[in-house]
Amino acid sequence: MLKEAYISRLDKLQEKYRKLQEELSKPEVIQDVEKYKKLSKELKELQEINELYERYKKAQKELKEAKELLKSSDKDLRELAEEEVNRLTEEMKKLEEELKVHLVPKDPNDTKNVILEIRAGAGGEEAALFAADLFRMYQKYAEEKGWKVSILSSNKTGLGGYKEVIALIEGEGAYSRLKYESGVHRVQRVPVTESSGRIHTSTATVAVLPEVDETDIKIKPEELKIETFRASGAGGQYVNTTETAVRITHIPTGIVVQCQDERSQFQNKQKALKILYAKLKDYYERKKQEEIAKERKEQVGTGERSEKIRTYNFPQNRVTDHRINLTLYKLQDVLEGKLDEIIDALRAKEIEKKLELVEKEG
């Protein structure tokens, strides 16, 4: 059975749905194109949860009737009623779970593409190799989901690691799945650079940002400082005789981005701007969240960049996600992009936390 707070919220949403239907049938609303469009959008957003709630109430009514038939003196009728009770109980469980998911406020960024940024942290060359392992893991996961991965900017090391790599991941549900990956990832293993066979701990930081439509962020030309320089390769040597690499500084925030992977200055500038827009949107949203958190005194799923979220332990073939105390002994599978088990568990936890807020708000 759904909790009273959920039923109360569903009743309110259903009432809102009915009122919207009434509004949309009024001649004055039909004639007002903008208002009609706005109300139609609201109605569409509530349609699925309204239909689910109707199915839930219908199943609840049928279950009550089937339970009454269990008292019948007719043996055949009782057997049929028992089957119906079992079927309806299962159906109601499924509908309850679906309704809970729909009660959680939607993240407007869930439908967006992703700007993925991985930076090597503590651990020198080994940290850079780990950053490359993480990038490969996300590439494999994207491949499995049918998403497209394009490198926007990268800084490779001599051994094939990454000091930093930034990529655009395009595809349905990319942000809704990958947003849980932001934070510090830690690896424990014997590095290829280690001759004595000792286990080292290294880190890499992952940031997952929604791709931003440039119309969402207003930047004045005078707020940008654009510099060009010659692109350099893994060993630091120059790989280009002309200044094709681009560095852009957003003066008000101090955010700096650079790109040198493309052959032309124009292409590098376009890619750098794409990264900058995503970082600025993230910067402003985080500031807004901090203000809300101060008022609310609590914050759901902060995804702090400095938070250690996961450990990859090679000697034990173990992956531990510290946010939900989930441990899996299938490290190689995870590194091959089998991330759904972890992401599903994180998503379930987020829904649970947000439902607690729904309960409080009633």
From Swiss-Prot:
List the keywords (alphabetical).
Answer: Cytoplasm, Methylation, Protein biosynthesis
Q: Which domain of life is it from?
A: Bacteria
Keyword Cytoplasm on entry:
yes
Which stretches are transmembrane? Answer: none
Q: Which GO terms describe its cellular component?
A: cytoplasm
Q: InterPro entries this protein is in?
A: PCRF, Pep_chain_release_fac_I, Pep_chain_release_fac_I_sf, Prokaryotic/Mito_RF, RF-1
Localization terms from the record: Cytoplasm
Q: Which residues carry this modification: N5-methylglutamine?
A: 237
Q: PTM comment for this protein?
A: Methylated by PrmC. Methylation increases the termination efficiency of RF1.
The Gene Ontology terms for molecular function here are: translation release factor activity, codon specific
Q: Which Gene3D superfamilies match?
A: 3.30.160.20, 3.30.70.1660, 6.10.140.1950
What family does the Swiss-Prot or TrEMBL record give for this protein? Belongs to the prokaryotic/mitochondrial release factor family.
Q: Which HAMAP family match?
A: Rel_fac_1 (MF_00093)
| Its job | Peptide chain release factor 1 directs the termination of translation in response to the peptide chain termination codons UAG and UAA.
Q: What is this protein called?
A: Peptide chain release factor 1
Tell me the organism: Aquifex aeolicus (strain VF5)
User: Coding gene?
Assistant: prfA
